[in-house]
Amino acid sequence: MKKYIIIGIIALVLILGGGAFALFSSLTGGPWEGTWWGVQEAGMNWSGDHIKTLETFTFTKNDDKTISVEHRVQQGSKEVEGRLSGSGTIDGGRLIVTTKRGKEVTFSYARIDKTIETPLKNVDKTAVTIKPLTEENNADMEEIRSEIVKISQKPENAIDTTLSSARS
């Protein structure tokens, strides 16, 4: 008899715990809100610099249950709009986004490490993952941004735009 009571109590605790987790997840808005950031490892350039691209994504819930995605990319000293900006819908732990160019891409949320896997790839073909921007990691993000700008401003990385003219 005691064995059945203990099993019943364990089952009840598991059911209540799962319900509480589901309620908490739905009330906190899930991962598809706020600003998230990550770094794309792009390899080495011709002058031996380790090239990185800072990727930031801002997810905004709309009244029609869609999610607006604003993708920004730090390219050298400029921050430009990324190619993954668009509008998406939630499908379980995934966000399916139709970009402004009409391409459909998928973002996947990993609950265990609380990161989002993007469709972007690093030089080693692994997916670029992003994490939420917080006060604690904002300094890390800005340090990476400053490294990217510094590398782009090195004289050996300047693009020569002068045209040479050959005389015959």
Indicate where each model-derived feature is located.
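N-terminal Sec-pathway targeting helices
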Residues: 1-15
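Small side chains
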Residues: 8, 17, 38, 82, ...
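Sec-dependent signal peptide cleavage junction
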Residues: 16-30
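Tryptophan-anchored aromatic micro-motifs
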Residues: 28-55
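Short beta-strand segments that buttress and anchor functional surface loops
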Residues: 37-41, 68-74, 95-100, 118-120
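N-terminal glycine/threonine-rich, aromatic-flanked beta-hairpin/loop signature
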Residues: 46-94
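Glycine-centered tight beta-turn/hairpin loop motif at sheet-sheet or coil-to-beta transitions
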Residues: 50-52, 77, 100-104, 121-125
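Edge beta-strand at a domain terminus
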Residues: 81-94, 106-168
